């Protein structure tokens, strides 16, 4: 498969690479190389054209608490321990209900996707069924976790 577009990425923290109007060759979900022209044997069904777009890598979040999604924006006036006691621990107790967990985790994952985060290392709760739901939803939505 080939993706045509304008690619922007950083091979190192002090280096920016721009590949304008090029093709990325993708094998098994991995970019194997870039080229300015397609091989002659390439059929149109193997090319996805984003030539009017800028393509950047997805973001990776290495430390995120999925159940705290429902706490976002709450308790800015609290120190850590009171915040945990007033907001986090009561909220995380609700994840004993798998229906509640599925609803929250679905919203959480959709938000990550919308912001370009497609890979993460997440903390869940002590509730085994709800934690499995998070991982199953993430896999079904195409995340790497």
Whereabouts are the PLM-identified features?
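N-terminal metal-binding scaffold of metallo-dependent hydrolase/deaminase domains
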Residues: 1-42, 53
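Residues that scaffold the ATP/ADP-binding catalytic core of kinase and kinase-like folds
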Residues: 11, 34, 69-70, 83
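Flexible loop residues that form catalytic
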Residues: 11, 65, 125
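Generic anion/oxyanion-binding catalytic loop in active/binding sites
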Residues: 13, 44, 90, 94
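Alpha-helical scaffold segments that flank or form the walls of functional sites
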Residues: 25, 72-123, 127-143
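Short C-terminal domain-edge/linker segments immediately following a structured domain
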Residues: 32-39, 64, 78-79, 89-93
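Hydrophobic faces of well-ordered beta-strands that scaffold small-molecule active sites
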Residues: 58-62, 120-122, 145
């Amino acid at each position: 498969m080939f993706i045509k577009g304008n690619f922007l990425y950083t091979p190192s923290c002090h280096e920016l690479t721009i590949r304008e109007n090029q093709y990325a060759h993708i094998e098994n979900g991995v970019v194997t190389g870039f080229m300015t022209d397609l091989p002659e044997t390439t059929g149109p069904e193997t090319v996805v054209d984003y030539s009017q777009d800028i393509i950047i890598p997805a973001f990776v979040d290495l430390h995120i608490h999925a159940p705290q999604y429902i706490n976002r924006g709450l308790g800015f006036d609290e120190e850590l321990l009171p915040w945990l006691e007033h907001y986090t621990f009561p909220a995380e107790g609700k994840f004993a209900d798998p229906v509640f967990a599925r609803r929250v985790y679905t919203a959480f994952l959709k938000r990550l996707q919308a912001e370009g985060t497609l890979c993460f290392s997440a903390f869940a709760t002590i509730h085994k069924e709800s934690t499995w739901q998070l991982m199953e939803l993430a896999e079904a939505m195409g995340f790497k976790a």
